[in-house]
Amino acid sequence: MSRAALDKDPRDVASMFDGVARRYDLTNTVLSLGQDRYWRRATRSALRIGPGDKVLDLAAGTAVSSVELAKSGAWCVAADFSVGMLAAGHERRVCKVAGDATRLPFADDVFDAVTISFGLRNVVDFSAALREMARVTRPGGRLVVCEFSTPVSALFATVYKEYLMRALPRVARAVSSNPEAYVYLAESIRAWPDQAALAQQMSRAGWSAVRWRNLTGGIVALHAGYKPQPV
């Protein structure tokens, strides 16, 4: 899979992530210039979780994000459809489950909070995934989506686009076990909805009071919403 198939085949995407699993965390830290750690902390803060809460970390990859969430004292489940990614994080002591975001292997209303970081872009039907996340979240529970987005400054957006399409693939060739996967990354980011459009998609999927906060000038956005209480 050398280019971004924007009508993504789930098997291709899972295979691609299996192939980059071994050096995934290192590559992300290098390509983000260390911002990935800040984004994980911001996600944990936005979830507003604490001891006793049950949290689903969807598209958790190697579970590095799940470990950050667990610092709150919450009980965290790391779920991903790439078995290779979960295996690469075997030393991280959180519960791990292989599963498809559009058909989650959990009962209704079981989690106090759900989050997905840099994974919603990779789901073939991300609206279905948003509905599934609502299904497994208890009424009043919270969703936080951490995802690449649209820089707020036109000048910054131009510089960022150049980084994505020119510099990022070159850096990936130096540090990644599968640099072609990062061509997919760049193209999928360019094709992704902006902040307002994603907020609309979340609302249509059943989430209420959807708001977003830009991080790193809008390179990343945190979208948060609640599952409504039954009337």
From Swiss-Prot:
CDD domains according to UniProt: AdoMet_MTases (cd02440)
- Catalytic activity as recorded in UniProt: a 2-demethylmenaquinol + S-adenosyl-L-methionine = a menaquinol + S-adenosyl-L-homocysteine + H(+)
- The entry marks the following residues as binding S-adenosyl-L-methionine, namely 62, 80, 100-101, 117
- The organism's superkingdom is given as Bacteria
InterPro entries for the chain: SAM-dependent_MTases_sf (IPR029063), UbiE/COQ5_MeTrFase (IPR004033), UbiE/COQ5_MeTrFase_CS (IPR023576)
Enzyme Commission designation: 2.1.1.163
Q: What class of enzyme is it?
A: transferase
- Name the Gene Ontology biological process terms: menaquinone biosynthetic process; methylation
Q: Which cysteines form disulfides?
A: none
Gene Ontology MF: a single term: demethylmenaquinone methyltransferase activity
SUPFAM superfamilies in the record, alphabetically? S-adenosyl-L-methionine-dependent methyltransferases
Q: In which pathway does it act?
A: Quinol/quinone metabolism; menaquinone biosynthesis; menaquinol from 1,4-dihydroxy-2-naphthoate: step 2/2
Q: For this UniProt record, give its keywords in alphabetical order, as a comma-separated list.
A: Menaquinone biosynthesis, Methyltransferase, S-adenosyl-L-methionine, Transferase
Write down the Pfam families for this protein, in alphabetical order.
Answer: Ubie_methyltran
NCBIfam families reported for this sequence: MenG_MenH_UbiE, PRK00216.1-2
Q: Which PANTHER family match?
A: 2-METHOXY-6-POLYPRENYL-1,4-BENZOQUINOL METHYLASE, MITOCHONDRIAL (PTHR43591:SF24), METHYLTRANSFERASE (PTHR43591)
What function does the entry list? Methyltransferase required for the conversion of demethylmenaquinol (DMKH2) to menaquinol (MKH2).
The entry's family comment says: Belongs to the class I-like SAM-binding methyltransferase superfamily. MenG/UbiE family.
Identify this protein by name: Demethylmenaquinone methyltransferase
- According to the entry, what is the taxonomic lineage of the organism? Bacteria, Bacillati, Actinomycetota, Actinomycetes, Mycobacteriales
Q: Which gene encodes it?
A: menG
